[in-house]
Amino acid sequence: MAFFRAYAAIVVRPVLAMYLLYGVAFEAHQQNSSVLFDATGRPRKLLIRDFGDGRSFAPLFQQRGHRIEPFTREGILPTTFDDDISLVRSFVIDACFVCHLHEVALCLDEHYLFAHTTPWHILREEIESAFDALRPRMLSDAFWLDERKAFLEQPWPTRSVLRMHLERYRDYRVEHELPNPVADLA
C-alpha cells in the first residue's frame, strides 16, 4: 500500500494544484500520464502530455494575474469557460480520478487482500492531504470548501463517451454520475 500511496500522491497533488489554484484541468488519465520512478522503484514525478483536450476556468486564472484567450474554431467545442467551473471540475474527476486512479485502485483491490486499509482509503487520504496543503494558497475559503466537498463527498461526474461519439460531439456536457468511491470513508 505504500507504493499506491506514493503513486496517488504524485498524481493527485499537481493535478489538484493546477485546478484549485489556476482553474486549469489537464486530461491526466493513464494514457496521458507518465510517472517517473527513482532507482528503487518509488514514484517521484508526474509528466502529463497531450494538452489538446484540457479545460480552464478563466476567472480563476485571471485572479492569479494571468490571462487566457479561449481557442475558438468552427467545429471545436470550447475548452475555456467563464461562468461554470463544474465543467472543468468534472474533467479533472473523470480523467484523473475515474479513468486513472480508480482503475489502479480496482486492479489492486482485485489482486491483493487488504487487512485494514483499502486503496480507496488511501486515495481519500491523499486527496485530503492535497486539499490541506493547498488551503493556505487559496483565494477563497468558500471555494476550497465547495471543491473539497465535490471531490470527497459528492457523486463523481464522468463523461458519457459513447453517447458523445454517437451524437458527434454536439454536446460536450453529456455526463452521468458515479458513486464516489472515497465518500463515507473518513
Predicted regions and their residues:
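Intrinsically disordered, low-complexity regions enriched in small/polar residues
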Residues: L21, R73, D171-V174
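ATP-dependent phospho-/nucleotidyl transfer catalytic cores
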Residues: M1-V11, F57-Q62, P70-F131, R135
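Catalytic activation segment of kinase domains across protein kinase-like and atypical kinase folds
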Residues: V24-R89
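Long, compositionally biased intrinsically disordered regions
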Residues: H111-A186
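Conserved kinase catalytic-core segment
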Residues: M1-V35, S90
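Generic local-structure boundary detector
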Residues: V15-M18, V35-I48, F57-Q62, I68, ...
